[in-house]
């Protein structure tokens, strides 16, 4: 695509993501068909100028300025391409609020990278954008599926190079994500975890991960059930989520194959067959309602296309 001129807008669509999927702590994540939209354009003026416009109530507390995560990511693109930074405006419509465990920071990073790259003629490859995204976020399990889409397993090889494996997620396995009104910051969730874990817990997680990946590939519910167990972070984070265990149990009783904390929480994810989706959704919302917590629980599929941009024809 041709490089947009100053004032011309592009639209970047970035999927929400779920990470730490089951036993895949800090390595396994998936893109959900719940997109965040970023309308972006170059603006005249100071190269450090960043204007942020939030549409709707989600993320209304976010602010612009040069320290905003979108703009910081954009600056990394321009630096890597050997270009001078430019002023930027972003009009943002979030599908889910921040601090819910659905990759809001990853969405901001990927939007900044993809949008900034597009606005200067796409000098960087998707592989380079992926490298920058992981470096900015500090871990790969949200930013990789946010950029690439699908189910992604990411690990650092002995060579210190990040390796990404696109795994198969059969379409018959659906996702219900119960998104509560309460917040939980990633930093708070990280602090709850111990610095060291028993080797038996690590071994159990490795085995569960292989079962889960096979279950998602084949649609085998029994394998998903046996694989959706974690010993590395969930035992320490469930107590931080008001009513979280009740929500999990309600989903399982309604027919879900397995449940997990989405990301660092507080959202709770359930995997189920499509014909159980509505029952699982209603049960999870009702369980949180019993704790005085408002929530919604959409039935979702995996988004396979990842992030993409296009010229904006008219204001939306």
Swiss-Prot record:
Cellular compartments annotated: Cytoplasm
Pathway membership: Amino-acid biosynthesis; L-threonine biosynthesis; L-threonine from L-aspartate: step 4/5
GO terms of biological process kind: threonine biosynthetic process
Domain of life: Bacteria
Molecular function (Gene Ontology), one example: ATP binding
UniProt entry keywords in alphabetical sequence: Amino-acid biosynthesis, ATP-binding, Cytoplasm, Kinase, Nucleotide-binding, Threonine biosynthesis, Transferase
Annotated EC: 2.7.1.39
GO cellular component: cytoplasm
Reactions performed catalytically: L-homoserine + ATP = O-phospho-L-homoserine + ADP + H(+)
Principal location listed in the UniProt entry: cytoplasm
Positions annotated to bind ATP: 97-107
Family label: Belongs to the GHMP kinase family. Homoserine kinase subfamily.
PANTHER family: HOMOSERINE KINASE (PTHR20861:SF1), HOMOSERINE/4-DIPHOSPHOCYTIDYL-2-C-METHYL-D-ERYTHRITOL KINASE (PTHR20861)
Function (record text): Catalyzes the ATP-dependent phosphorylation of L-homoserine to L-homoserine phosphate.
Name of the protein in question: Homoserine kinase
Lineage: Bacteria, Bacillati, Cyanobacteriota, Cyanophyceae, Synechococcales
